[in-house]
Amino acid sequence: MSNNCTNTVPRPEVIAALKDWNFAVSVILLFITVLLQWGYPSRCKPIWVIKMFILWLLWPLSIAAAVFAAIHPINSVAFGFAIAFACISGIMWLSYFISSFRLLCRTGSAWSFMPETDMLINIPLLGRTVTRPIISDSPAVQFLIIRGELRFDGFTLGRCDPGDMPDIVTIARPNALHWYKRALTRNMYTRSAILVYIKYKVGNHRVQNTTEDGDRLAMFVA
């Protein structure tokens, strides 16, 4: 004896659901594609800012979703996974804030809360220190000056001549400060050059931030 009764969704309901949600899904997928492909400072800064804002929101949203799943569990197994995911998300979010505050105390820059990286490059330039995020750790960094405009990794850092560039730049991390010494300056044409800095030492120091009003030292929390 066979049971021919099956719990299936009627085809018209499936087609109706696809018609209702197809446009919304396509918009969401397009939005994600644009963020992933164009969300870089060297391509489109407004999209990159939106991408960073979404990254900031993902941690609290994931924690809230896990807590909600623990309060209203489907079963005991789902309750256990919800508690585990909530704890993992909370620990990782706390770790992010600890690293960000350590980097803030080392550099004094709001870029320390950048969710995409925990490294900041610091360039003493014409009486001030320019700080920007850097994604990858490398034994050498390169700057490009085009007609007096200093560029690095998609960022425009300001206007200067090749002779205004410092001999030393630093890259700060939560647990260390890396020093880079200028190793090559290749002048191309008027007020344009390529400059290469090579890492030569690592230490546990503060970043000295110079401004037009005087010298300021960022406090460091070990």
UniProtKB/Swiss-Prot annotation:
Gene Ontology MF annotations: structural constituent of virion
Entry keyword annotation includes Cell membrane: no
Topology feature Virion surface, residues: 1-20, 73-80
Compartmental location: Virion membrane; Host Golgi apparatus membrane
InterPro entries with a match to the protein in the record: M_batCoV_HKU9-like (IPR044360), M_CoV (IPR002574)
Tree of life domain: Viruses
Pfam families: CoV_M
Topology Intravirion: residue spans: 42-51, 102-222
Membrane-spanning segments: 21-41, 52-72, 81-101
PROSITE patterns, sorted: COV_M
Keywords: Glycoprotein, Host Golgi apparatus, Host membrane, Host-virus interaction, Membrane, Transmembrane, Transmembrane helix, Viral envelope protein, Viral immunoevasion, Viral matrix protein, Virion
GO cellular component, one term: viral envelope
Its membrane topology: Multi-pass membrane protein
Family stated for the protein in its record: Belongs to the betacoronaviruses M protein family.
Subunit structure: Homomultimer. Interacts with envelope E protein in the budding compartment of the host cell, which is located between endoplasmic reticulum and the Golgi complex. Forms a complex with HE and S proteins. Interacts with nucleocapsid N protein. This interaction probably participates in RNA packaging into the virus.
Function: Component of the viral envelope that plays a central role in virus morphogenesis and assembly via its interactions with other viral proteins.
Protein's name according to its UniProt entry: Membrane protein
Naturally occurring in which organism (per UniProt): Bat coronavirus HKU9
Gene responsible for this protein: M
